[in-house]
Amino acid sequence: MPREIITLQLGQCGNQIGFEFWKQLCAEHGISPEGIVEEFATEGTDRKDVFFYQADDEHYIPRAVLLDLEPRVIHSILNSPYAKLYNPENIYLSEHGGGAGNNWASGFSQGEKIHEDIFDIIDREADGSDSLEGFVLCHSIAGGTGSGLGSYLLERLNDRYPKKLVQTYSVFPYQDEMSDVVVQPYNSLLTLKRLTQNADCVVVLDNTALNRIATDRLHIQNPSFSQINQLVSTIMSASTTTLRYPGYMNNDLIGLIASLIPTPRLHFLMTGYTPLTTDQSVASVRKTTVLDVMRRLLQPKNVMVSTGRDRQTNHCYIAILNIIQGEVDPTQVHKSLQRIRERKLANFIPWGPASIQVALSRKSPYLPSAHRVSGLMMANHTSISSLFESSCQQFDKLRKRDAFLEQFRKEDMFKDNFDEMDRSREVVQELIDEYHAATQPDYISWGTQEQ
C-alpha cells in the first residue's frame, strides 16, 4: 500500500531545490520531462505513486504544490522543459506579486490572507491520495516567503492534519559572512520556533557546509546556486530511495523518522553523502565497499552541516540511519557495523543503545553510476545545537539594539510589541539546552525535575 507524500515548495529557494528534486526523480524513474514514461523504463519494481499520480492520459504528475509570493522562479520553471510536468492548478502565485521582501512578518501575514486558496490546493491533493502519509516542505529559513509563509503553513498543517507527518528540508543561511538579508537572524529564529514545535522531522541543509563541500570535495571554485541545489537534490532523492524502491524495511516515512528520533523535540537531522566526485578519472581508482562508504559517512568533511567543535560538551550521536544504494552483500553490512562499534568510530549517547541502522536500497536501473556503492547518512547528532547557537547570537546582536525592526512593525502581529520574537528566542534556547542535556546520562529524567 503506497503511502503518498505531498511536497510543498515555498519561495525562491524552496521552488529551486524542489525543481531539481523532481528533475532527479524523473531521471531515476525513467519519466520524461513531459511526465510520460520512457520506452526503456519497463522495470515495474519502483513505486512511482508515492510522489507522483497518474492523470487520465497516463501522464505522471508530481504530488507537488508550488507556492510563491513573487513570480520569478515559478515563471522560470514554467519556461523550462519541465513546464508540462506539473499540475497547473497546483501552482499558486500571489495576486500582487510583490513578494515578502525578505521579511518573515510579511510572509506570515500574507499567509493568513491567502490561506483559503492555498488550502484548497492542498486539500484537493490530499483527497486525491489513497492513504496520505504526510507532507514534505522545502523552504529556506532566512528570506521572507520560505520562512514566513512556511511558518504559517507549518502551524496550519498541524491544526488541519494533526495525524499526518510533516517533514521539512530547511535551508539554513550562511553563517560566516554577512548575508544579503539584514533581518535574516530575525527570520531564522521566528521560523526555528515553528520547526521545533510544528514539524516532525527537519532535515537541515546548511548553506555554509554545502558551499564548503562543493569547493573542497567537488573542486568548484565559486559554486553557483544551481550546483549547490544539485547537491541538495542528491540528498533529497537519496533520502527517499527506500520509499521509492521499497525493501522490507524503512519503506515508509514513519519508519525512517521513528528510527532517528527517539524524543520528539530533538528532530533536527544532518546528512552526509559519499562518494562525491564529479571527476570521472578519480572515480575509478577505488573499489567502494560498504565499510568504506560507512566509514566515510562518519567523517566530518562529508557531513553537510557545519557545526563548531565545542570543548565543553561531549557531543554525540543520538541515532544514525545509513541508506546504502547499490550492489551490497548484506553480510558485509553486519561486519561493517561491528567494525564501527569495535573501533568506536562514532560516539553515541550515554542513555540509550548505540542506534546505527542500515537500510539497503536499489539504485535506479535507468541512471548510469560511476560507483558500485553510494551512501547517505541521516544522523541525529547533538552538535547541531551549535547551528542554533550561532543563530541566537546573531539575533541577540540585532535585538539588543532593536535594529531593523521597522519593517516588522508594519505588520499587525508586531504592531504593539515584539513578544513573538522573544518567545521564539526562548523556544530555541530550550531546544539548545535539551540538546546539551541529551549528552548526559541523566537525560531520561531531564525536564521532570523542574516541574
From Swiss-Prot:
GO terms under cellular component: centrosome; cytoplasm; cytoplasmic microtubule; cytosol; gamma-tubulin ring complex; microtubule; microtubule cytoskeleton; nucleus
A biological process from GO: cytoplasmic microtubule organization
Molecular-function GO terms, alphabetical: GTP binding; microtubule nucleator activity; structural molecule activity
PTM per Swiss-Prot/TrEMBL: Phosphorylation at Ser-131 by BRSK1 regulates centrosome duplication, possibly by mediating relocation of gamma-tubulin and its associated proteins from the cytoplasm to the centrosome.
Main location: cytoplasm
SMART domains with a match to the protein in the record: Tubulin (SM00864), Tubulin_C (SM00865)
Residues bearing the modification Phosphoserine: S131
Quaternary structure and interacting proteins, as annotated: Component of the gamma-tubulin ring complex (gTuRC) consisting of TUBGCP2, TUBGCP3, TUBGCP4, TUBGCP5 and TUBGCP6 and gamma-tubulin TUBG1 or TUBG2. TUBGCP2, TUBGCP3, TUBGCP4, TUBGCP5 and TUBGCP6 assemble in a 5:5:2:1:1 stoichiometry; each is associated with a gamma-tubulin, thereby arranging 14 gamma-tubulins in a helical manner. Gamma-tubulin at the first position is blocked by TUBGCP3 at the last position, allowing 13 protafilaments to grow into a microtubule. Interacts with alpha-beta tubulin heterodimers; the interaction allows microtubules to nucleate from the gTuRC.
Protein name (record): Tubulin gamma-2 chain
Annotated organism of origin: Homo sapiens (Human)
